[in-house]
Amino acid sequence: MKIIDLSVPMINTAKEPYPPKIEYESHEQGAEQAAALLDLEKSDFPDEKAWAVETVTLTTHTGTHVDAPWHYAPKSEGKRARTIDELPLEWFYGDGVLFDFSDKEAGYELQIKDFEQKLTEMNYTLKPKDIVLVRSDADKHLYEENYAMIHVGVSAEATHWLIDQGIKVMGTDGWGWDIPLPQQAEQYKKTREDNILWAAHFVGKEKEYCQIEKLANLDQLPVPTGFKVACFPINIKDASGGWARPVAIFYE
C-alpha cells in the first residue's frame, strides 16, 4: 500500500489570506507551566523540561479543509444547510478521480466540456460518490504573495454537472473552488450580473455538496483513477468547514 499526502502544511509562512498563527512553547516553558499547575518547582522535572505545546489561531477555512453546505448558504435543497459535524462520513472515503488541468492559465474557468474531454481521455465514466480532484498546481505557490490568485476555477454549470453525476465531494489544489475572488469582482463590476460572485459555491443552495480546498501534491498521483481518497473533516460543532488531511491510497 502507498499513501500520498494531499494536504498543505499548517505553517506561519503560508501566504493565504487567513494564514494560521502558530505559537510554539518549548519543553523548558512546559516545565514552568507544569510546575505552576502542580505547585512544584521547574527543577523538579528531569533536565527542567516537560511538555512542548503549540497554540494555533486560525479559521475553519485555513489550510486544507472541507467546506460544509452551511458555508455556502443557510439553506440547501430547501432545508437548513448541514454543518460539517452533520455530514455522513461515508462521503469522505471513495474512489478518486484526478482531472489534470495544470496546463490551463490562472483564472481559467472550467466548463462541462473540459471535464467531459478529460473523461474521454481517461476512458472513464464518473459514478456516484467518486471523489473528484482538480489539479492546477496552485499549491506550488503557497509561499508566494499571489497564492490565492493563481488557480483555475470551476464554473457553476460544471459544478451542477458534477453533482448530477452523483459527486458529493470535489476538491481543488487552488485557494478556492471558484475563479479567484478579484477576478469575480472585476467581472461583476462590468456586468452586475447575479451569476458571477461565488457562483460555484452558491450551487450549494440548490444541491448539497462539499468542496475540499487547498489540496496539494496532486502532481504526485501516477494515474488519474484506480486509487482511494480519504478526506475526513475534523468534527467541529455547528461549523461551516473543518480541517482535513486528505490522502490518496494505492492498494498494491
Language model features: what each stretch is:
Residues M1-E252:
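Active-/binding-site microenvironments in catalytic and ligand-binding cores
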